[in-house]
Amino acid sequence: MGEVRGAAREVRLRTVEDRDLDVFFGHQADPEAIEMAAFPARDRDQFAEHWARIRADDTAIQAAIVTDGAVAGNIMSWEQDGQRLLGYWVGREYWGRGIATEALAQFVGQVTARPIYAHVAVHNIGSIRVLEKCAFRRDRGQEEKAPPPEDGVEELIFVLDA
């Protein structure tokens, strides 16, 4: 995590708008964030296709994370292989301010389907802390069933049951 830059005054979730996608693209292209998330950046075309699929997916629930009037990131949940999954991405300039934690707390309050699973790179301590603060627990049983990572990056699996 980056240095603490002061707590955000307000965090809210809202519908993703077309204009948010440029902000999201910049977040996912940040080299430090890529390393932390252990997730490769997409080029513009791949990114546009990815978000077109998300927005067309009837199982996907997505929101823009807004703090102090600026788009700080995104959060979403979708069904895959019979599980409801969770993902979020917050711009590095917003790390360490409690924004991801507050956004996740709001999101899981609105998305009532359970269980919800989150996969996180073992070295992404900030994201692990966010999940734990929002009552997710590590699911070692799911980790044992998971195939070995194709990219060699060990993942932990967290679940919110209730």
PLM region spans:
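Acyl-donor (CoA/ACP) binding surface of acyl/acetyltransferases
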Residues: 1-22, 26-32, 36, 62-162
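Short loop/turn motifs at secondary-structure junctions and domain boundaries
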Residues: 53-58
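Conserved GNAT-fold acetyl-CoA-binding loop/helix
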Residues: 32-52
